[in-house]
């Protein structure tokens, strides 16, 4: 397994009341089962559902924004990405992000650190939002997008390309308000399949055509949001990559079943048509 981290089992806490409108509360899956749903195994199999759906799927969380320093190998990989040919796409900030970066650095235990130093001090990729607008980002290992192209965009616009994401976009105002409230802590997880073995799935790194299942990887992201105060919020992403052949038969069957229920639009958005054909779904 190529892994930044294991998704933390037991990181969630029961879903008590959030002070948000009920329509948004329903989208947050406030019932207790949502907690179990996102406390995933080391390869994130609890994220895989049949049928596949696109939603907000936020759960209250006790997970840390960062599990701490990366390994030396991972830090070197991040540094190489930030200073490589695609670096300008991966790390940047708006001119008004200074106060938020100060709060984020203090929250992570690195007061005074700049954005790159913060990113290199954490296992996770990092982002900073103010009232739901992206103000800074340091994503060494993005999933199919150019991170700095999203700077200055609000939550709904950032997620505009997401196929079948109407519920997510409609809830964007409530999500932005909730993540900015004092003490707010949320988590969610997402998964996909890829033929690109690198942690970075930047669109400048084209995915190889896949001809055998052994060339596939199951990729998961564990995402955490913490309110930082003054309407700022920190956002982190930990990535896990597991080779298809290292999954159990039951896990491969579940992934295939979920993929079989994805809409054509979602398959296109995730670049999964060729993989679906290989899996005969």
PLM feature spans:
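Extended, well-ordered protein cores
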Residues: 4-16, 20-281
């Amino acid at each position: 397994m190529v892994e930044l981290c294991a998704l933390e089992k037991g990181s969630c806490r029961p879903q008590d009341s959030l002070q948000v409108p009920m329509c948004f509360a329903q989208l947050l899956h406030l019932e207790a089962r949502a907690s179990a749903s996102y406390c995933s195994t080391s390869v994130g199999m609890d994220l895989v559902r049949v049928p596949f759906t696109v939603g907000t799927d936020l759960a209250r969380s006790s997970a840390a924004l960062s599990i701490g320093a990366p390994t030396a190998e991972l830090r070197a990989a991040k540094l190489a990405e930030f200073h490589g040919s695609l670096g300008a796409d991966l790390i940047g900030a708006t001119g008004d992000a200074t106060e938020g970066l100060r709060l984020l650095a203090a929250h992570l235990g690195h007061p005074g650190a700049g954005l790159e130093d913060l990113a290199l001090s954490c296992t996770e990729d990092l982002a900073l939002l103010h009232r739901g607008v992206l103000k800074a980002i340091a994503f060494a290992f993005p999933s199919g997008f150019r991170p700095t192209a999203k700077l200055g965009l609000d939550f709904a616009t950032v997620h505009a390309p997401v196929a079948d994401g109407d519920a997510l976009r409609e809830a964007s105002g409530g999500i932005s308000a909730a993540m900015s409230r004092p003490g707010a802590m949320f988590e969610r997880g997402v998964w996909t399949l890829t033929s690109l073995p690198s942690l970075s799935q930047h669109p400048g790194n084209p995915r190889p055509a896949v001809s055998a299942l052994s060339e596939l990887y199951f990729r998961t992201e564990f995402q955490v949001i913490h309110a930082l105060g003054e309407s700022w919020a920190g956002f982190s992403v930990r990535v896990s990559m597991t080779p298809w052949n290292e999954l159990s038969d039951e896990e491969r069957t579940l992934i295939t079943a979920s993929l079989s229920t994805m809409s054509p639009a979602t398959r296109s958005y995730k670049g999964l048509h060729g993989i679906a054909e290989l899996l005969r779904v």
